[in-house]
């Protein structure tokens, strides 16, 4: 038998028993830590506890409400290089923290505004929140990064502030004013987040265009948009608004005779029907051109002869039509026809910010919230690549990028004129930059209608093709560097309402010297069966 001393010795040296005992003792010693709040300046100076509410109860009792603000904290390493006067002031609403609400997707604008308001109020209930973005060396890169951030974070006010405004000393008062207005108003700010966003971005790129010469109104000579911009086309044309800085989407029109006579201003022969189809019955072949008969007008004849082999031929054009078409007033398109003019005349970078902004607004009006989130995710993949490629680029580098774009476009235009394939070229923000005559014949939209204003490639696609567009964009531009991708089915919208052109589209991506997507070339071929 074991003596009592031996039993005590065994119990104390048992590893399992000793571990359980130590764990129990640690539990007793360990107590729940209280959540600590950032003390105000007055409480921090006296080393007393404080609360999250501003002004705190102690400052109210002492009459120090005017100076009751958060005490400055030690800056993080990533903020070490930024002076204190340039750091944005934190916005502290006087509202209690609200419960997190799951937004309900709704197409109505009122519900989206309410969701944005809730997101903004929740974002700034944390007193430790610090707004910070990477500082680019180029203003053009700054503004483009800001609009990309705005697309990704739709419910966050801090990410809607462009970086130039964020680091501007003159706007620190406006930032604090936003916070004060949220304190005084029981439901938040008086202006909606979308209005605030549009106002800030409008100020951003209006300054960039201040020194530019005024653009002539695109439709001053020929009224091509009098019926192509929806029900308010006449008002838009009469207002003389700048269609390069403001976006109005193209809208297909009902045509009783399934032709484009409603938009042909100068037919070849006024005594004849401008859309009289030229057809050779002996070989069952149709003849098309960009002025009288286009491919959308063949929808009904092709449907009648769907069981027969049909060929389509393009009528030969005059030698003058093959000349390079440039326009100095079209900043987004080919501006000059010689390399010397490109290198000597382009002295400012092209701003993609207005294009991204208006693209987002257009998608909001056209698609529901669920589709919009998926599209924004595809655009969001561009942001880290944009930071890596352009954070060290200067303003001179961005000017050189635009010169490279114009020089590359000039060479491609010469090549495209020889191959005869319907081709459309657009920038990385989706803005159409160039189309050839074959593309005009295929889709029915003329070159002037597409390039005489801010037009996006997604405007002339149906809904399903737009969804595939952003998926293809993320593949070809951000995931792999093969430089080409194929859309098996791309449905183009024609000016005739209800007439859709089924095509197969091959993408070719061209990058600049820094690796950023420079331009996208789309070759479209119709699917006849």
UniProtKB/Swiss-Prot annotation:
Q: What molecular function terms (GO) are annotated for this protein?
A: DNA-binding transcription factor activity, RNA polymerase II-specific; RNA polymerase II transcription regulatory region sequence-specific DNA binding; zinc ion binding
Using the record's annotation, list all stretches that form the PAS domain: 408-480
What InterPro entries does the database record attribute to this sequence?
Answer: ERT1_acuK_gluconeogen_tf (IPR050335), PAS (IPR000014), PAS-like_dom_sf (IPR035965), PAS_13 (IPR056751), Zn2-C6_fun-type_DNA-bd_sf (IPR036864), Zn2Cys6_DnaBD (IPR001138)
The UniProt entry's GO biological process terms, in alphabetical order, are: cellular response to starvation; gluconeogenesis
* SMART domains with a match to the protein in the record: GAL4, PAS
Family classification: Belongs to the ERT1/acuK family.
Q: What is this protein called?
A: Transcription activator of gluconeogenesis
- State the organism named in the record: Saccharomyces cerevisiae (strain JAY291) (Baker's yeast)
